[in-house]
Regions:
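Transmembrane beta-barrel domains of outer membrane proteins
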Residues: 81, 102-104, 168-172, 181, ...
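Phosphoinositide-dependent membrane-docking surfaces
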Residues: 72-81
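Periplasmic N-terminal soluble interaction domains immediately after the signal peptide in Gram-negative
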Residues: 85, 91-95, 103-105
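Non-catalytic regulatory/gating segments with a bias toward low-complexity or hydrophobic composition
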Residues: 1, 8, 43, 78, ...
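Outer-envelope exported proteins of Gram-negative bacteria
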Residues: 38-40, 114-116, 179-183, 200-204, ...
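Residues embedded in well-ordered regular secondary structure
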Residues: 4, 16-21, 31-38, 46-67, ...
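A conserved hydrophobic secondary-structure block that centers on an alpha-helix together
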Residues: 76, 175, 195-196, 202-205, ...
Length: 301
């Protein structure tokens, strides 16, 4: 829908692979509340029950949204609704507009088998503008002497990928139509150790009775979903804070070995020397966050 519907702004979340997508229709309507549109799938409102990640220094991992459970190849059509007409049908939940999604049914035809693949790649494109001319004076403040060292945050990011494989089967007669589909979605985010995997299975049968005066439409979906290491909000669990504020002039390769053996405690501990990076912010080693503070969310429904 991006760039195809007037007055609709669509942006991906900053939580990485598997994160929710923000859909805002005709501008923001609230400064403090949610501005996302309501999804209605086959006439059923789907509310986003995922976590937003929270605010403050210790915000948690964000969540996905209801429409992310769908196999894209199961979608027949998408339309938008806003204003009084949306409120009349769906009440106050539709104050920010409605995205109407209709899924596919079986068709009156012989057996039709479709196999599809979609592969996309992503990279970190725009970095915050930071000065790299002066090194570190004390703590994390970069206003020391001139330095010839160059630190590029892009070195932390990977090339992300999103691969969707799908197979659909449709068949039917004048009185009965059947539709089956199965799909896999496998994504690797641009951040290390961030991934999203989803497996969809759909079955739907439509039968007409009493000279087409009565229609019985039965459908079922089974979804297996795994979110691994979506980026946390706030400061402490967010690797991007320490990545972007890393003092210029220091050696970033030194912290890539993110853990050291602590003889006193007899365990591996995080390597993040506060003598270099200061204690003004609640930050952690970004490699430690992505490799040792794994936050996973699994769902079967």
């Amino acid at each position: 829908l991006a760039g195809k519907v007037a007055g609709v702004q669509i942006s991906s979340g900053a939580t990485g692979a598997g994160g929710a997508t923000r859909v805002v229709m005709r501008g923001m309507k609230s400064l403090t509340k949610n501005n996302n549109a309501l999804y209605v799938i086959d006439g059923v409102p789907m509310f986003n029950t995922g976590s937003s990640g929270g605010d403050g220094q210790y915000g948690s991992m964000g969540g996905s949204d209801a429409v992310a459970d769908l196999n894209p190849d199961d979608i027949e059509s998408i339309s938008m609704m806003t204003g009084p007409s949306a409120a009349a049908l769906y009440g106050s939940a539709a104050a920010n507009g409605v995205v109407l999604v209709n899924t596919k049914k079986g068709k009156k035809e012989k057996i039709s088998l479709t196999v599809s693949n979609s592969t996309t790649f992503s990279k970190a494109y725009i970095m915050p503008e930071m000065q790299n001319r002066y090194g570190t004076s004390s703590g994390l403040f970069s206003w020391g002497d001139l330095t010839d060292k160059r630190y590029d945050p892009k070195d932390f990011f990977n090339t992300g990928s999103n691969i969707i494989n799908s197979i659909t089967l449709s068949t039917g007669s004048d009185k009965n139509q059947t539709y089956f589909s199965a799909s896999t979605t496998n994504s690797d985010g641009i951040l290390p150790n961030n991934s999203y995997n989803r497996y969809n299975f759909t079955a739907r049968n439509t039968t007409n009775f009493l000279n087409d005066k009565l229609t019985l439409d039965i459908g079922a979906q089974y979804i297996i979903q795994n979110n691994k290491n979506m980026v946390g909000s706030g400061e402490y669990f967010n690797p991007l804070v320490s990545l972007y504020l890393f003092p210029r002039g220091e050696n970033f390769e030194e912290v890539q070995m993110y853990e050291r053996y602590d003889e006193a405690r007899n365990i591996m501990t995080q390597y993040w020397p506060t003598a270099i990076f200061g204690s003004e912010l609640n930050m952690q080693n970004p490699y430690w966050i992505m490799n040792r503070m794994n936050m996973n969310a699994n769902k079967r429904s």
